[in-house]
A protein has these predicted regions:
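Cap/insert and terminal regions of metallo-dependent hydrolase folds
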Residues: 14-20, 24-115
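A short acidic, often aromatic-flanked loop/helix-cap motif at beta-alpha or helix-coil junctions
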Residues: 116-121
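Anionic-ligand binding region
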Residues: 1-10, 15-21
Length: 121
């Protein structure tokens, strides 16, 4: 529900400026999300396309699942599992219910990312 003002009118924001950082490491691609407004799965696929890297080592940041429906969370979890992500550090706009589901689904590969978190690339 984000909007931009164009020619004096409010229009849905297409979020062209949504940003993420992609790092190619020896362990695979590391994706650092801002808020993933365009979708965490879309961001991962875009990272793979831009870098040519298939293996995903880590996804870190906000997944924008806080206000997502249960169906959307379930679909996102299934897609995330298909990437065989080794480390998933959720925070910010992921929300506690979705974070709990990610923790249950990813087990030891999941952590609550916060200020001061460290990860070896």
């Amino acid at each position: 529900n984000l909007y931009v003002k164009e020619q004096g009118q409010l229009k849905p924001d297409p979020l062209w400026d949504d940003q993420a950082l992609f790092i190619k490491s020896e362990r695979g691609l590391v994706i650092i999300l801002g808020c993933a407004h365009r979708g965490v799965i879309n961001t991962i696929r875009h990272a793979q396309k831009l870098t040519g890297e298939g293996a995903i080592y880590a996804v870190i940041g906000g997944t924008h699942l806080m206000a997502a429906s249960q169906q959307q969370v379930d679909l996102t979890l299934a897609e995330l599992l298909s990437f065989d992500i080794q480390r998933l550090g959720a925070c910010h706009c992921t929300g506690l219910p979705a974070s709990a589901m990610l923790a249950q689904t990813f087990g030891e590969r999941f952590y609550f990312n916060n200020a001061g978190s460290r990860i070896n690339l």
